[in-house]
Amino acid sequence: MRIFATEVQTINSFVRLESFKEVYGLIWEFLPIFSLVLGILTGVLVLVWLEREISARIQQRIGPEYAGALGILQALADGIKLLFKENLRPSIGNTTLFSIGPSIAVISILLSYSVIPFSNHLVLADFNIGIFLWIAISSIAPIGLLMSGYGSNNKYSFLGGLRAAAQSISYEIPLTLCLLSISLLSNSLSTVDIVEAQSKYGFWGWNLWRQPIGFIIFLISSLAECERLPFDLPEAEEELVAGYQTEYSGIKFGLFYVASYLNLLISSLFVTVLYLGGWNISIPYISILELFERDQIFGTTIGIFITLAKTYLFLFISITTRWTLPRLRIDQLLNFGWKFLLPISLGNLLLTTSFQVFSL
């Protein structure tokens, strides 16, 4: 009996060990996702603080200064405040659409970060159709905004949702045509391959110089997709109170707030990856690949720093544009997208295609 009890204890110990290995393996698989989400949220907090500080300097006033050193925790304090606020719902309206609209907007944007290469071999999912996957996923966000506007049973909210859908459709087509031009130059739809294709010729190999027209169109279309001034028609305060956000409060209003900055950050990252060489540094005789081969941790850290530095440079341009240009009318916005950006982006694609065909 003692031998039998010993065998049972041995078997149980092996079962526990196997269970521990399975749990450890599961945690290890989800660790990159958790790290990416944590890094994204940290980047959003820094972005909110930067926008408030830069806006304060432009307006010659004092920005946030009480929540943490230099007010850097102000966004976190605002999030905690919204978390404990009452979550109101419209008495007459579609509560299902009203509830799931903000979640759809946030989740669709978060999934787009999976194809961003922050450094060499540091990408969550390197798909062969990475940039098209971003376009497909980001197209879901306006549906959430339209659902929120319709479910609120409010004329201002519904008009804001309609404007968001119309604006997204109008400016997503020129943006997609610019992506096609980039993919033709790089012979790939993978974000990693696009960055590596720009690294062959150093600073002058960036797509910023090879596709200057496409860069300007992509820049404008990205601001329109993010609903930033002068393209914030879906939530124009003077016309629609707060647009599709009018009836929201508490954490659901906070989700829209987070989704706006997540969208701005992902657009800036794609500008860096597609046009500014990604993680590559333009200093002669210094290559991130060589640094990575010598020391993987150091090379990866330098690559992340370069990517984020370029990203926040574009974010600075977006923030200053907010306080520089006046808002367009809805008819001006749609005419600008359909009658100006679309023909130019199509012509740019045809020129790029002709160049690639004749260079073969």
Curated annotation (Swiss-Prot):
One of its GO terms (biological process) is aerobic respiration. The chain crosses the membrane at residues 30-50, 98-118, 127-147, 165-185, 203-223, 248-268, 297-317, 340-360. InterPro entries: NADH_UbQ_OxRdtase_su1/FPO, NADH_UbQ_OxRdtase_su1_CS. GO terms for molecular function: NADH dehydrogenase activity; oxidoreductase activity, acting on NAD(P)H, quinone or similar compound as acceptor; quinone binding. The keyword Chloroplast applies. The keyword NADP applies. It is an enzyme of class 7 (translocase). GO terms for cellular component: chloroplast thylakoid membrane. It comes from the Eukaryota. Pfam families: NADHdh. Its main location: plastid. Keywords: Chloroplast, Membrane, NAD, NADP, Plastid, Plastoquinone, Quinone, Thylakoid, Translocase, Transmembrane, Transmembrane helix. It catalyses: a plastoquinone + NADH + (n+1) H(+)(in) = a plastoquinol + NAD(+) + n H(+)(out); a plastoquinone + NADPH + (n+1) H(+)(in) = a plastoquinol + NADP(+) + n H(+)(out). It is a multi-pass membrane protein. NCBIfam families: PRK06076.1-2. HAMAP family: NDH1_NuoH. NDH shuttles electrons from NAD(P)H:plastoquinone, via FMN and iron-sulfur (Fe-S) centers, to quinones in the photosynthetic chain and possibly in a chloroplast respiratory chain. The immediate electron acceptor for the enzyme in this species is believed to be plastoquinone. Couples the redox reaction to proton translocation, and thus conserves the redox energy in a proton gradient. NDH is composed of at least 16 different subunits, 5 of which are encoded in the nucleus. This is NAD(P)H-quinone oxidoreductase subunit 1, chloroplastic. The gene is ndhA.
